[in-house]
Structure formats: C-alpha cells, structure tokens
UniProtKB/Swiss-Prot annotation:
Record localization: Cell membrane; Cytoplasm, Cytosol
GO cellular component: cytosol; plasma membrane
Protein name: Bargin
Function: GTPase activating protein (GAP) which specifically converts GTP-bound RAC1 and CDC42 in their inactive GDP-bound form.
Segments of this protein annotated with the region Mediates non-covalent binding of poly-ubiquitin chains: 574-677
Modified residues (Phosphoserine): S183, S270, S272, S552, S558
Biased composition (Low complexity): 1-13, 29-39
Taxonomic placement: Eukaryota, Metazoa, Chordata, Craniata, Vertebrata
Record-linked Pfam families: BAR (PF03114), Hydrolase_like (PF13242), RhoGAP (PF00620)
Length: 677
C-alpha cells in the first residue's frame, strides 16, 4: 500500500429528513406574525394618522376655550372676557343718565353681554364633555394602547426570528458533529443535543407568545374598525354644538337689537331680523297659542310653574313682590324666542311669577272666560259652602276644553303653593287677591261711567271664586297631575329641590341705612317688619351672592330736606295702595324691594333723594314720602307687585292690612294715574 500525502477529506453527508408541512408553516410564520395583511393592513396604516389628528385637534380646540377648563358654571362665567365686559358696562352706565339714549343702549348691551357669556360658558362645557374629553381618551388612551400592542408584537416576532436562527444553527452544528465521527453517546454530542432541545422549547414558548400577542393586536384592529364611525361623530357633534351656540347667540342678539331699535324709533329692515319668525306667546288667545305650538298647556304657564316648583315654592311673597322691569321683559322675550334658554331665570322666582301673571293678564279673554263671568259671580254669591262648591263645579264643566285644562293645571299648582304658606306667607286668600284679577275680569263696556265702582265690587267676588277654586282644587279637579306635561322640562321633586335658603333668614337689625347728607332722627319703637319687608330684604342679600344681573337704574332728583319729627305719633297705618307701611319718626322712608315700573315712576317723580345716590332695583334708602297726602310722618315703605287697579282694589276690599294698609288719599283715583293696563 502506497503511503503518500493524504488526499482531501470527504465530508460526511448527514441524511436530512424529508421536509414536513409544519416546517413550511414555521418558515412562513415570521412573515404572518409580523402584522395583518389585506384590509386589516390598510386599517393598521390609519392608526398613527388618527392618533396624530386626535391629538392635534384636541390641542387646538383646547386653545379655543375662553373659560377656565374643567371649572363649574359660575367660576367659568366669571373668567370669561364677555362677563368682564358686562361688568364694566354695568359700572359705566351707573354714571350716565339712564333716560339718555347712551344710557339705555349701554344698559341693554350690559344685559346681552351677560347673557352671551352664559351661553358661551354652556357651549364650552358641552364642548368639553362631548368632544374634547372623547378626543383626549382616543389620542391618549385608546389608540396608544393599540400601537403598544403592535410594538410588543414586533419585538416578539424579532426575538422569535433570532431564536429560530440560533436553533437552526445549533441543529446544523449538532449534525456536523455527528458527521465528523462523534459518537452518539459522547459528551460533546450530548451537550449539543441538550442545547438543541432547550432552544426548541424556548422557540415553542416564544411562538405561543407571538400568536397570543398577534390575536390581541388583531382584536384591537377589529375594535378600531367598528368604532371608526363613532370617532367620526366627535367632529359631527362639534359642528352641532357650534351651530346651537351660534343660533342661541343670534337669537339673543336679535331680541336685544329689536328692543334697542324700537326704543330709538328706528325700524329694522335687516333680512336676518325680518326672516326670523317666533311663535306668538303673549297677547294672543289661548286657543291660537296652543294650536300654533301644538301644546295642551300654554308654554308660559307650564314653563313658569316648572321653574317655580324647582326654585320658588318657599319664596316669601311669591306673586306679590315685583321683579325688576328689565329682567321681566327679557324673560318674556326669551319665552317667545328661545324657551330652551330659561335656566338663568330660575334663580329669580319673582321674575318667573311676574311672567306668569303677565301672561294671564295679557290674554285677550280671561282664562275663566267672559261668557261665564256672570255664572262665576252667581256661584261666588252663594253663602252655603256645599251649594257654592256644586255651582263652581258646574261652571267649570262648561269651560272650553283648553281653558279647563289650563285652569286645572294652574289651580293644582296654586294649591301646592298654598301648602307652603307657613314659609311663603301665601295663603289661598293672599294668592287669590294677587292672581284673581288676572284670571277673571268683566267685559269692557264703552261709555259705562260706573265701571270703576263695579270693578271694585267684582274684584271682591273674583277673589272669593279663585280662593274657593284653590281650596277645593282636589275636589273640583280630581286626580293627580304631571306638571311636566310636554316633557320639555326637567322633572322636579318638590321636597328635594325647593330651596329654603330664604325661609331661614331674618331681616338684620342694621338694615336701615342713614344718608350722610341727612341726619337721622331718633326713631320711635316700631312694630316688627311686615312679611313683604322681610322678604325683600332677604332677597336682596341673596341676590348679592349670585352673579350680578344688570338692574334698571333710575337717577333721582333734588336732595331731601330735613324735616322735624312728627308730633302725633299715634297715627298708624299710612302707606300706598302698593306698599306695606309702618310708622316710625320724622319724614324719612325706607324703600326696600324691587319696584314695578309704576312704583319707579312714583318714587322718581314724588320722592326727594340725594342726587349723589342712584336708585337701583333692590336698593334700600331713606327718603321723604311726598305723594298722596303729605302725611308728615315717617314710614317704612316696602314695594309690592301690584300693577293693576283691580289688584289694588282687591287688596283694599279684602282688608289685608298686613299687606296693604289704607293710605290717606281722597280716592283710589289719586293713585291710579300711572297704573299700567
């Protein structure tokens, strides 16, 4: 045998097992696990742009907010530039003549800026709730969670591919070792085989994690697809909120502009104004109003009742104390133009009560009808209670259906109001005195010289009819009643929602201020304040705690003259038809409450007040009483809500001296010249 140089070694060929189907699956697994293909792949490409869009739009929308983000209504309104503008206007028009064109325009502008600020605050709060918060969750929570799953899947797939490469290399090394002559039982072969087994187990575990993560990621993508339409609705909702905000703002501005132009005698030819049509509410017949709006209960009746149930049932002197003229006028205009924006008036129950009285008073025909006037009077004249009740029931049955429904609704409410008489001081008799002349009055007869005297007699009978209706409401109008008939107003529970903040307050002992220009005489002991006085004083303190509303200022005239004390202090019960009066000393009077326009005229024309002072709605100040007979004695004057002759007559006829003591005048006519019809 020749011994030469060794030839090249022939590598041992290790037989490879035939390819298995699962090997093909594993080869394709990294690609399949890397992410979805097809339609879901397209969805996957939309994730990052959607996240960026939600984030950027949320950021820009947040920058559009003018109020304090996340704050409640009151705090937000105070921070708005519009409210700062309204406050500046309110401070400015106090220095102007309120009867001047600029003063009137500035006062109305102040009120409208206040209203626009509240509309803006409501818009921003709705925007935060319905758009900003959902966009924040989408960009900061929902989409980042999906993208996090995607990133986790990519990392797992990368780790899996690395491990598969190591396993493949280890398998090759194990085969090479066996081909080079390593015996199956050798230490190196055993070590290599163990390594391969370990890598296979790790690869199987990692493969399971990849599949689990991929399933979760695909589920996230499917969830995103199903919710894409709801995400799009965020932007639709944004436009809806903006449209509602601009509509409400435009309605408020149109109403204010119409009033301003009317006051300035300028006819408005603006297309936007002439094209706007508001349903008729005040001054139109009940049947026409109900037909135009498709309602069962008149809008002012239901709206005012719902607001009073919410905030006013325990308000002392409700329906008796008058609201500010500007507030009442704005409430009536809002009732016709935008009844969904009445929330701001809930905190002023006297304005709400005034709006209800005004609606009943402005009906072309009284709610209890002209046709049945004589029948009501005959029923009231019956002395026997049972016969009177039966007669009233018979007259009620003859009312037109729409009148009966609204009268039943109103009487049920007034009966509930009377249940709180211990707090609100409004007994069925007091309620009837105030509201009776607004529910029924005789038909006008031209040329009837005796109508004034007849009105005084009929007022007494009307009060008796209405008082009986209130006292017997459950008998005359059986069954429970749902005051939220239309479903347009928030349901209220009287025991839970009626505020009793005024019921627990008392008039402070320091309530009577003394002007710096007039030395105050030593007052004689006076009786306790009348209910109306306490109510007005407590209301003034309460209103100082809520956001201020522009009042109706009246600049007064000459300064008062200091008068000598009255010699006869025994004379008592002096006052006006529209005032509760108590005698004190000197010739000074304390004016408390919210005067009606008529009482404003009486005060500004007949009172002498320091010209440095400005008479505002709700102010209290000392002055001389100079209208009627100059009684020459001190009085404490509390203005009430009497604004019609019939109401004044009803006060006197009922002998309600706690409400309206007699005034020393020649006749009722002495005080009726300025009364509004």
């Amino acid at each position: 045998m020749d011994r030469g140089l060794p030839g090249p070694a022939t590598p041992a060929v290790t037989p490879q097992p035939p390819a298995r189907p699962q090997d093909d699956e594993e080869a394709a697994a990294p690609h399949a696990a890397a992410g979805p293909d097809g339609q879901l792949g397209t969805v996957e490409q939309r994730l990052e742009p959607a996240k960026r869009a939600a984030h950027n739009i949320h950021k820009r929308l947040q920058a559009c907010l003018q109020g304090q983000s996340g704050a409640d209504m009151d705090k937000r309104v105070k921070k708005l530039p519009l409210m700062a503008l309204s406050t500046t206007m309110a401070e400015s028009f106090k220095e102007l003549d309120p009867d001047s064109s600029m003063g009137k325009a500035l006062e109305m502008s102040c009120a409208i800026q206040n209203q626009l600020a509240r509309i803006l605050a409501e818009f921003e709060m709705t925007l935060e709730r319905d758009v900003l918060q959902p966009l924040s969750r989408l960009s900061e929570e929902e989409l980042p969670a999906i993208l996090k799953h995607k990133k986790s899947l990519q990392k797992l797939v990368s780790d899996w591919n690395t491990l598969k490469s190591r396993l493949s290399q280890a398998t090759k090394n194990s085969g090479s070792s066996q081909g080079l002559g390593g015996s199956p039982g050798s230490h190196s072969h055993t070590t290599m085989a163990n390594k391969v087994e370990t890598l296979k187990e790790e690869e199987e575990e990692l493969k399971r994690k990849v599949e689990q993560c991929r399933d979760e990621y695909l589920a996230d993508l499917y969830h995103f697809v199903t919710k894409e339409d709801s995400y799009a609705n965020y932007f639709i909702r944004l436009l809806e909120i903006q449209a509602d905000y601009h509509r409400r703002s435009l309605s408020s501005l149109d109403t204010a502009l119409a009033e301003l132009r009317e006051n300035h005698g300028q006819a408005d030819h603006s297309p936007s104004m002439t094209a706007t049509h508001f349903p008729r509410v005040y001054g139109v017949s009940l049947a026409t109003h109900l037909q135009e709006l498709g309602r069962e209960i008149a809008l002012p009746i239901e709206a005012c009742v719902m607001m009073l149930l919410s905030e006013g049932m325990k308000e002392e002197g409700l329906f008796r104390l008058a609201a500010g003229a500007s507030v009442l006028k704005r409430l009536k205009q809002t009732m016709a133009s935008d009844p969904h924006s009445l929330e701001e008036f809930c905190s002023d129950p006297h304005a709400v009560a005034g709006a209800l009285k005004s609606y009943l008073r402005e009906l072309p025909e009284p709610l209890m009808t002209f046709d049945l006037y004589d029948d009501w009077m005959r029923a009231a004249s019956l002395k026997e209670p049972g016969a009177r009740l039966q007669a009233l029931q018979e007259v009620c049955s003859r009312l037109p259906p729409e009148n009966l429904s609204n009268l039943r609704y109103l009487m049920k409410f007034l009966a509930r109001l009377a249940e709180e008489q211990e707090v609100n001081k409004m007994t069925p008799s007091n309620i009837a005195i105030v509201l009776g002349p607004n529910l029924l009055w005789p038909p006008e007869k031209e040329g009837d010289q005796a109508q004034l005297d007849a009105a005084s007699v009929s007022s007494i009978q009307v009060v008796g009819v209405v008082e009986a209706l209130i006292q017997s409401a459950d008998t005359l109008f059986p069954g429970d009643i749902n005051f939220n008939v239309s479903g347009l107003f928030s349901a209220v529970t009287l025991q839970d929602t009626v505020s009793d903040r005024l019921a627990s307050e008392e008039l402070p002992s320091t309530a009577v201020p003394t002007p710096a220009t007039t030395p105050a005489p030593a007052p004689a002991p006076a009786p306790a304040p009348a209910p109306a006085l306490a109510s007005a004083a407590t209301k003034e303190r309460t209103e100082s705690e809520v956001p201020p509303r522009p009042a109706s200022p009246k600049v007064t005239r000459s300064p008062p003259e200091t008068a000598a004390p009255v010699e006869d202090m025994a004379r008592r019960s002096t006052g006006s038809l529209a005032a509760a009066v108590e005698t004190a000393s000197g010739r000074q009077a304390l004016v408390v409450g919210k005067p009606s326009p008529y009482m404003f005229e009486c005060i500004t024309e007949n009172f002498s007040i320091d010209p440095a002072r400005t008479l505002m709605v709700g102010d209290r100040l000392e002055t001389d009483i100079l209208f009627g007979h100059r009684c020459g004695m001190t009085t404490v004057l509390t203005l009430t809500g009497v604004s019609r002759l019939e109401e004044a007559q009803a006060y006197l006829a009922a002998g309600q001296h706690d409400l309206v003591p007699h005034y020393y005048v020649e006749s009722i006519a002495d005080l009726t010249e300025g009364l509004e019809d």
